[in-house]
């Protein structure tokens, strides 16, 4: 199963693609879509949508996992983040892909084993789990973490369905 993880942001949207083969997780690609803050916000949303649509067309994931919105101190920032998430989700559902959402705490729990892990701990675990030569860029690392979270969650769901 190929999983696309997305860490949405209005300035940088991270993506991480992994392949789950049995119990193995294999790194496929990761990176970020950068938008220019000088551009009008709708143009930035279009760049997120188009960039993710191209990534979906290239790698053909079977499922998309997106990090859920955190509570921001600034209401305007929270609204922009929500709109960036919307652009990312629409890129997936536009081609019929299922979308699963995970909180930051769920992602940290799945990757490190504790929902209160520090960002550096998560990055080091991703490097180890995916056998990366170096720690991925922050937004890409977060997206890989979301993909890993889904891989673990999907595996658990499949096990539970088999028990019933």
Curated annotation (Swiss-Prot):
Mg(2+) 1 binds at residues 7, 139. Binds 2 Mg(2+) ion per subunit. One of its GO terms (biological process) is DNA repair. CDD domains: RuvC. GO terms for molecular function: crossover junction DNA endonuclease activity; DNA binding; magnesium ion binding. The active site is at residues 7, 67, 139. One of its GO terms (cellular component) is cytoplasm. The keyword Cytoplasm applies. Its main location: cytoplasm. Gene3D superfamilies: Ribonuclease H-like superfamily/Ribonuclease H (3.30.420.10). Mg(2+) 2 binds at residue 67. Homodimer which binds Holliday junction (HJ) DNA. The HJ becomes 2-fold symmetrical on binding to RuvC with unstacked arms; it has a different conformation from HJ DNA in complex with RuvA. In the full resolvosome a probable DNA-RuvA(4)-RuvB(12)-RuvC(2) complex forms which resolves the HJ. The RuvA-RuvB-RuvC complex processes Holliday junction (HJ) DNA during genetic recombination and DNA repair. Endonuclease that resolves HJ intermediates. Cleaves cruciform DNA by making single-stranded nicks across the HJ at symmetrical positions within the homologous arms, yielding a 5'-phosphate and a 3'-hydroxyl group; requires a central core of homology in the junction. The consensus cleavage sequence is 5'-(A/T)TT(C/G)-3'. Cleavage occurs on the 3'-side of the TT dinucleotide at the point of strand exchange. Belongs to the RuvC family. PANTHER family: CROSSOVER JUNCTION ENDODEOXYRIBONUCLEASE RUVC. This is Crossover junction endodeoxyribonuclease RuvC.
């Amino acid at each position: 199963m190929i999983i696309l993880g997305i860490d949405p942001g209005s300035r940088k949207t991270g993506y991480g693609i992994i392949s789950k083969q049995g119990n193995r997780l294999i790194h496929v690609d990761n990176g970020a879509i950068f938008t220019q803050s000088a551009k009008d916000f709708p143009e930035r949303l279009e760049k997120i949508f188009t960039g993710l649509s191209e990534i979906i067309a290239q790698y053909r994931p079977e499922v998309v996992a997106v990090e859920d919105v955190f509570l921001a101190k600034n209401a305007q920032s929270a609204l922009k983040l929500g709109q960036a998430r919307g652009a990312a989700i629409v890129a997936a559902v536009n081609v019929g892909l299922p979308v699963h959402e995970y909180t930051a705490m769920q992602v940290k729990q799945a990757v490190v084993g504790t929902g209160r892990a520090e960002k550096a701990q998560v990055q080091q675990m991703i490097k180890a789990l995916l056998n990366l030569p170096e720690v991925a860029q922050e937004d890409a690392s977060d997206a890989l973490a979301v993909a890993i979270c889904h891989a673990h969650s999907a595996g658990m769901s499949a096990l539970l369905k088999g028990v019933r």
